[in-house]
């Protein structure tokens, strides 16, 4: 063996080890980045066999579906959890559609077969902007509970079928896991915090309802009064959605819409935290805006206390039309 060979041979193993560490370090971020807020049907088809990928079908009466629609056909291996009935929103303190408690979240999520390491792909029906809100609210709830890897199937079940992907019928039985929830307070806003914002500022209140609700011409049945939280700006969740494709609009269009809103911290709300979940999802998850939260109690909780202020363009004529049966 030459002197040169003797000098370099012992370095071969450490050098390879160092190279391996570099490769692993570079690969780790790439793997983390692969979990995107929206995934395509092609991506889901490719990853259906992955042990950590969990397909969560949330179709409900909101989209004209539910358990019956799931039984007729769903993404292979999917587990159904009715957004409207399973407990994703609960009544607390007499106020409906609220975020479940931590123990309730642990039970709901764990019994489905989801834990902290699961990559959940939420599948809505894919038929309407309100239906997308079901997926966005479920996505937000999972994130709030501490599930780090969550995505929504772009276009939902309708897109999966339209792209001629395989479906299966019948019931799917979950395999429960132990799930320990860790509440992510950075994603949510409570009524007290919103009241401080209304009084003193510090964040933009974004009302995700249609303009007629914002103006006080309409209200949700569960809300006690008309109008909006004073100082809020209106950003109807439907403006982010393309009704022709039943998907969110392209990224550039979403960014253009979002650019019309004030910058800085923001809190989205609507009637029940459903439409507002779409605004939150677009701003926070797709556009990467920092410090965007969801006031899940929204107008139903806000108006449950008559002392909380409201702004409204409602007139006596609007009230008269309602009395006569011509208005809301």
Language-model-detected regions and their locations in the chain:
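C-terminal soluble interaction/assembly domains
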Residues: 246-247, 252-256, 262-315
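Bacterial N-terminal signal peptides that target proteins for export
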Residues: 2-17
């Amino acid at each position: 063996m030459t002197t040169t060979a003797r000098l370099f041979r012992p370095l071969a193993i450490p050098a390879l080890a160092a190279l391996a560490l570099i490769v692993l370090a570079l690969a780790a971020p790439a793997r983390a980045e692969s979990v995107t807020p929206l995934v395509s049907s092609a991506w889901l088809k490719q990853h259906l066999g992955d042990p950590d990928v969990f397909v969560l079908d949330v179709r409900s009466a909101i989209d004209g579906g539910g358990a019956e629609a799931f039984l007729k056909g769903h993404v292979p291996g999917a587990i159904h959890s009715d957004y409207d009935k399973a407990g994703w929103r609960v009544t607390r303190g007499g106020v409906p559609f609220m975020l479940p408690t931590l123990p309730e979240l642990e039970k709901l999520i764990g019994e489905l077969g989801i834990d902290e390491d699961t990559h959940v792909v939420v599948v809505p029906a894919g038929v309407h902007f309100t239906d997308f809100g079901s997926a966005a609210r479920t996505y937000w709830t999972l994130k709030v509970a501490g599930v780090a890897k969550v995505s929504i199937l772009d276009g939902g079940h309708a897109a999966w079928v339209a792209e001629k992907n395989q479906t299966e019928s019948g019931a799917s039985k979950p395999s429960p896991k132990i799930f320990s929830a860790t509440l992510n307070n950075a994603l949510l806003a409570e009524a007290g915090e919103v009241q401080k914002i209304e009084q003193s500022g510090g964040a933009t209140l974004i009302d995700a309802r249609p303009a007629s609700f914002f103006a006080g011409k309409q209200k949700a049945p569960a809300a006690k009064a008309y109008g909006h939280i004073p100082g809020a700006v209106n950003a109807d969740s439907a403006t982010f959605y393309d009704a022709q494709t039943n998907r969110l609009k392209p990224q550039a269009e979403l960014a253009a819409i979002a650019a019309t809103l004030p910058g800085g911290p923001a809190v989205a709300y609507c009637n029940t935290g459903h439409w507002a979940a779409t605004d939150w999802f677009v701003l926070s998850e797709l556009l990467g805006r920092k410090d965007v939260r969801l006031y899940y109690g929204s107008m139903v909780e806000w108006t449950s206390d008559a002392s909380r202020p409201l702004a409204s363009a409602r007139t006596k004529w609007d009230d008269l039309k309602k009395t006569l049966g011509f208005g809301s």
